[in-house]
């Protein structure tokens, strides 16, 4: 019994040293296990085109679909960035999309990232000039522009906008947390480290 306890303690110490070594030489390795990064080339390509942080797009994709391209929500949102077909039609019209069928095309990972990135850039531009513009863009991505516009109109000048939906407040906080994790784990691959 005593030998087994000593062996267990030695094994735990060796495991702890191994963990510390890997954590020191490969920072963020544990984050990469929990939070994968797929479609890196599409993410990096479109964020440069739309002037966004690649960690932000990776975080939104993770939060929306966990990088599952064939994801479909109960509300009808489709693909990696969970775009509604009606939203995607509007994006297609603004970006020159032709012969666009949202019921099928939104499952294409590259197109979904392109449209989702464009939409997020559009929302950031729409709310630019406000100190909480980044949060408002994420809130609008999650809850819709009409809700955010209403919240803004109900907010006294100079005050931060109060997001009325708890799920949307959680969404914004979760995306911010994920952005920091993706920067830590993949900053070198995303160019945002």
Predicted regions and their residues:
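Hydrophobic membrane-insertion alpha-helices, especially the h-region
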Residues: 4-22
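Catalytic glycan-binding domains that act on GlcNAc-containing polysaccharides
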Residues: 19-193
């Amino acid at each position: 019994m005593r030998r087994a306890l000593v062996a267990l303690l030695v094994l735990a110490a060796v495991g702890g040293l191994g963990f510390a070594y890997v954590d020191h030489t490969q920072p963020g390795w544990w984050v990469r296990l929990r939070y994968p990064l797929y479609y890196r080339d599409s993410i990096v390509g479109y964020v440069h085109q739309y002037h966004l942080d690649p960690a932000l797009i990776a975080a939104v994709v993770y939060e929306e679909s966990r990088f599952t391209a064939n994801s479909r929500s109960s509300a009808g949102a489709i693909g990696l960035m969970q775009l509604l077909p009606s939203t995607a039609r509007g994006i297609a019209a603004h970006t020159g999309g032709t012969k666009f069928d949202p019921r099928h095309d939104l499952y294409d990972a590259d197109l979904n990232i392109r449209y989702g990135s464009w939409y997020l850039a559009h929302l950031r531009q729409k709310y630019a000039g406000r100190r909480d513009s980044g949060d408002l863009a994420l809130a609008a991505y999650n809850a819709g522009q009409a809700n955010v516009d209403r919240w803004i109109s109900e907010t006294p000048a100079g005050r931060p906008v109060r997001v009325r939906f708890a799920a949307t407040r959680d969404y914004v906080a979760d995306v911010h947390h994920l952005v920091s994790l993706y920067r830590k784990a993949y900053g070198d691959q995303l160019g945002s480290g």
